[in-house]
């Protein structure tokens, strides 16, 4: 689970001309036999716009999601299947205007996709022949999340002064007495109300890194002795999240307020870091974990495949065809058409909003930090 700043969904995005645009796979390095991002670049391809399922499928390829074959999607499909099979098949998973599905419908869809995976490389038209494409009205607002890496020490020392706290044992009882709220970020950081209680999991080099770790909800600590450890979300203090980007825009400090712009401002203005961060009262606590980012299904999320959704709008276990033009350092923007799986949620993800898990590489950091774009989406339902 993770926190993200809500995005505005417009009435729609204009139909984009079918001009030649470089198409990339968003491949990441360091993933076993997977190829690198550069090896996946295709010379030409249309930008993503509001388009028909037929046009979408024509330009759909597994390499877009760092896969050499659709077969490699099988482990992700199995994760969703385990989840939906735990639900009563006849129970309603979603019932809203334009979409009513039972858990059995979701299971049937996943089983059909699993059955087709060996054939899809040669027969992509099977996506159209075997599934109904239920379009999400007015499209989706897309953003991204990733697995951050935070420099840390197991002990406090010069250069490592920012505490990363475990869940306080008194928080549940305190919340009962104070309308569901614990200490604010300002109280925790300025008044040091948790210091000296043995809750420090580690000490980070940069408070800004820890702040963005809270937004993502999980990541890796890279210790000064060369070791690493997974760190996962354990709980939140009950106060409403307010994004630092919004705070800085309201103060006239930034125009856009994306994460890269924020980081540069914090680097240039270290004396004001606490002032800005403490205006967000929300605070996240952590625990050490044995694996990477874990979604709402209880399984590790998969890069370019796992989607965080509002489960009241798109239920967990849903197969989603999604399209968005993603930011790219070299080319500015590259089209991504993919098949995704609703496997995670986030506190600020509401209705027509999807958060794409981008992985743990530098490229994942760049895409997730800059992605803020509209695009089409369809819920796939087995015919």
Where are these regions (language model features)?
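N-terminal start and proteolytic maturation junction detector
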Residues: 5-7, 25-27, 40
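Solvent-exposed, well-ordered loop and adjacent helix/strand elements within mature globular domains
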Residues: 31-383
């Amino acid at each position: 689970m993770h926190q993200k700043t809500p995005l505005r969904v417009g009435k729609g995005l204009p139909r984009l001309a079918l001009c030649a645009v470089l198409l990339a796979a968003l491949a990441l390095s360091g993933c076993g036999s997977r190829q690198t991002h550069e090896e996946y670049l295709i010379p030409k391809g249309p930008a993503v716009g509001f388009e028909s399922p037929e046009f979408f499928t024509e330009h759909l390829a597994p390499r877009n999601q760092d896969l050499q074959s659709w077969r490699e999607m099988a482990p992700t499909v199995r994760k969703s299947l385990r989840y939906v099979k735990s639900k009563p098949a006849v129970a309603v998973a979603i019932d809203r205007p334009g979409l009513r599905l039972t858990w059995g419908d979701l299971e049937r869809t996943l089983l059909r996709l699993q059955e087709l995976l060996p054939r899809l490389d040669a027969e992509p038209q099977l996506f159209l022949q075997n599934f109904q494409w239920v379009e999400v009205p007015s499209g989706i607002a897309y953003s991204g999340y990733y697995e951050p890496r935070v420099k840390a020490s197991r002990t406090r020392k010069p250069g490592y002064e920012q505490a990363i706290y475990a869940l306080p044992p008194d928080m549940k009882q305190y919340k009962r007495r104070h309308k569901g709220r614990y200490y604010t970020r300002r109280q925790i950081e300025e008044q040091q109300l948790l210091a000296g209680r043995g809750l420090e999991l580690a000490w980070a080099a940069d408070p800004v890194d820890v702040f963005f770790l809270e937004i993502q909800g999980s990541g890796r600590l890279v210790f000064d002795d060369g070791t690493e450890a997974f760190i996962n979300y354990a709980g939140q203090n009950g106060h409403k999240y307010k994004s630092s980007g919004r705070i800085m825009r309201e103060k006239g400090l930034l125009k856009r307020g994306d994460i890269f712009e924020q980081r540069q401002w914090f680097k240039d203005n270290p004396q004001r870091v606490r002032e800005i961060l403490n205006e967000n009262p929300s605070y996240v606590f952590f625990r050490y974990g044995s694996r990477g980012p874990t979604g709402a299904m209880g399984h590790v999320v998969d890069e370019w495949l796992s989607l965080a959704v509002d489960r009241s709008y798109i239920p967990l276990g849903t197969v989603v065809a999604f399209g968005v033009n993603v930011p790219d350092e070299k080319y500015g923007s590259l089209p991504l058409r993919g098949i995704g799986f609703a496997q995670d949620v986030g506190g600020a993800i509401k209705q027509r909003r999807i958060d794409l898990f981008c992985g743990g590489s530098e490229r994942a950091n760049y895409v997730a930090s800059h992605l803020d774009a509209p695009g089409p989406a369809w819920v796939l339902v087995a015919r």
